[in-house]
From Swiss-Prot:
This is Pantothenate kinase 1. Keywords: ATP-binding, Coenzyme A biosynthesis, Cytoplasm, Cytoplasmic vesicle, Endosome, Kinase, Nucleotide-binding, Nucleus, Phosphoprotein, Transferase. The active site is at residue 363. InterPro entries: ATPase_NBD, Type_II_PanK. The lineage of its organism: Eukaryota, Metazoa, Chordata, Craniata, Vertebrata. GO terms for cellular component: clathrin-coated vesicle; cytoplasm; cytosol; nucleolus; nucleus; recycling endosome. It comes from Homo sapiens (Human). It is found in: Cytoplasm. Belongs to the type II pantothenate kinase family. Residues 32-161 are annotated as: Disordered. The modification Phosphoserine is found at residue 215. It comes from the Eukaryota.
Length: 598
């Protein structure tokens, strides 16, 4: 019980706390405030240690007594009734920063006595370990009423364990003056019932568990993310995307070292995605998996598997996003790494329809990182890079492997819908030199207008059967032969589509001729710009990449011929097997990097 007793005109007060906390014994605490009187009703000029003669004023102590049934009497520091009335003492708070009061288990008790004053300073009341309730009448309300009794300065000092262990050697600063609190720590009504517990403050009340509404798939995703985080790898599936203006390029890593435990824990939609992507070579009407480009037995981020290369037209992007929503892809991943202009264009659609966030990456950064990685791992035991030997002689021209172990510096020509030309001096040091809007998109668009074809494959197939000299005006059409002064051969193109000014020529050409002339026009323009950039940058290796070169042997041989002929053998045109997928590979590598950074 916490009791406040005043005296001396309200200037003096004593606060006592009595209760049971230690093995059926009664623990009592008192705090006294200095005032004008030495006791409640008057006395010496100042407060001393409670019950200690000649003690210095202000050197107050906090004492704890333990009174049990077997105890024969009480020390001089104990004032009040010895049976049923509790214990009361007066103490002044000395100036000190902390309070720690321990009981040395007198009379069989155990645990730590914690003062309510210290607990109140921290905003709560705590209690030491409790055992059996005390016998009736020991500090409860059924016994004699508690009262404050003035302490005689001349009383003898007791030497009980309570007096020794109750001595506080440091003390503490008194808390701000607050209205008196009444705290009862004993049983009510003198019964054997357990003592009442103080109600906990709201912030200490046990909080009910929040209801869980997550689906099993989301719980599994969380568990897999936690497991993957410990291994510094992202959760499956692993994708990288390059969303271009004409084509979407997608790379997918299929793990081949799945353990029995992983397969058992694998959620159904993850199995469905893996099976769908790896068991088909066509997806819908336009999606294609380039099986011949698959990289096998590859180790990525500590896992062994195969890397698959998939493409589909950008116009089918909304169908792809819808499929991701139907397969509940967001339960496996919340973020996809994507590069290319479409990563910005379709960002909102991914978020609204499929509940997926796109991590947008720079396409030129991804291009370089992906190219260097694929070249470093090789193409299933073969070199990734190659060139054409004897490009000026169609009969002797053949494909040869090229070692790109030391690639710097190189001129990188990315031939997609448009063209970008980069001068690369190291892995992280490059610049965009120039570009042109006349690229693969131009070729396909003109072919669709001129020939009625609908796909890139159709346009290339028609071009392979056509003759561009029926459409273009050549040097020999102007000079009647070579222009020897400047080394121009009569077969060189003087004017692309120059013969189409003549109605007679227009009536005699075929759609295949138009497709071939369109391909030669675009290719010659790119080759001319690349050669000038290589000369300006003083670089002798020109690497051509991009989906404009996919299954496009005509353009590759034309570029090889142009580089070799116009540079008199000083420039070498280089090509790569995975022409247009390097941006998507770079996006996949960024997925691993994001996990490492975390």
């Amino acid at each position: 019980m916490l009791k406040l007793v005043g005296g001396g005109g309200g200037q003096d007060w004593a606060c006592s706390v009595a209760g049971t906390s230690l093995g059926g014994e009664e623990a009592a605490f008192e705090v006294a405030r200095p005032g004008d009187q030495g006791k409640a009703g008057g006395g010496s000029p100042g407060w001393g240690c409670a019950g200690i003669p000649d003690s210095a004023p202000g050197a107050g102590v906090l004492q704890a007594g333990a009174v049990g049934p077997a105890r024969g009497g009480q020390g001089a520091e104990e004032v009040g009734e010895s049976a049923g009335g509790g214990e009361e003492r007066r103490v002044r708070h000395p100036q000190a920063p902390a309070l720690r009061l321990l009981n040395r288990k007198p009379q069989g008790g155990s645990g730590e006595i914690k003062t309510p004053e210290n607990d109140l300073q921290r905003g709560r009341l705590s209690r030491g370990p409790r055992t059996a309730p005390p016998a009736p009448g020991m500090g409860d309300r059924s016994g004699q009423q508690e009262r404050s009794v003035p302490h005689s300065p001349g009383a003898p000092v007791g030497t009980s364990a309570a007096a020794v262990n109750g001595l506080l050697h440091n003390g503490f600063h008194p808390p701000p003056v607050q209205p008196p609190h009444v705290c009862s720590r004993g049983p009510v009504g003198g019964s054997d019932a357990a003592p009442q517990r103080l109600p906990l403050l709201p912030e200490l009340q046990p909080q009910p568990l929040l209801p869980q509404h997550d689906s099993p798939a989301k719980k599994c995703r969380l568990r897999r993310r936690m497991d993957s985080g410990r291994k510094n790898r992202p959760p499956f599936p692993w994708f990288g995307m390059d969303i271009g203006g004409t084509l979407v390029k997608l790379v997918y890593f299929e793990p081949k070292d799945i353990t029995a435990e992983e397969e058992q824990e694998e959620v159904e939609n993850l199995k469905s995605i893996r099976k769908y992507l790896t068991s088909n070579t066509a997806y819908g009407k336009t999606g294609i998996r380039d099986v011949h480009l698959e990289l096998k037995n590859l180790t990525m981020c500590g896992r062994k598997g195969n890397l698959h290369f998939i493409r589909f037209p950008s116009c089918a992007m909304h169908r792809f996003i819808q499929m991701g929503s139907e397969k509940n892809f967001s339960s496996l991943h919340t973020t996809l790494c994507a590069t290319g202009g479409g990563a910005f264009k379709f960002e909102e659609d991914f978020r609204m329809i499929a509940d997926l966030q796109l991590h947008k990456l720079d396409e030129l950064d991804c291009l370089i990182q992906g190219l260097l990685y694929v070249d470093s791992v090789g193409f299933n035991g073969k070199p990734e890079c190659y060139y054409f030997e004897n490009p000026t002689n169609p009969e002797l021209c053949q494909k040869k492997p090229y070692c790109l172990d030391n690639p710097y510096p190189m001129l990188l020509v990315n031939m997609g819908s448009g063209v970008s030309i980069l001068a690369v001096y190291s892995k992280d040091n490059y610049k965009r030199v120039t570009g042109t809007s006349l690229g693969g998109g131009t070729f396909l668009g003109l072919c669709c207008l001129l020939t009625g074809c609908e796909t890139f494959e159709e346009a290339l197939e028609m071009a392979a059967k056509g003759d561009s000299t029926n459409v273009d005006k050549l040097v020999k059409d102007i000079y009647g032969g070579d222009y020897e002064r400047f080394g121009l051969q009569g077969s060189a193109v003087a004017s692309s589509f120059g013969n189409m000014m003549s109605k007679e020529k227009r009536d005699s050409i075929s759609k295949e001729d138009l497709a071939r002339a369109t391909l030669v026009t675009i290719t010659n323009n790119i080759g001319s710009i690349a050669r000038m950039c290589a000369l300006n940058e003083n670089i002798d290796r020109v690497v051509f990449v991009g989906n404009f070169l996919r299954i496009n042997m005509v353009s590759m041989k034309l570029l090889a011929y142009a580089m070799d002929f116009w540079s008199k053998g000083q420039l070498k045109a280089l090509f790569l097997e995975h022409e247009g997928y390097f941006g998507a590979v770079g996006a996949l590598l960024e997925l691993f990097k994001m996990t490492d950074d975390k």
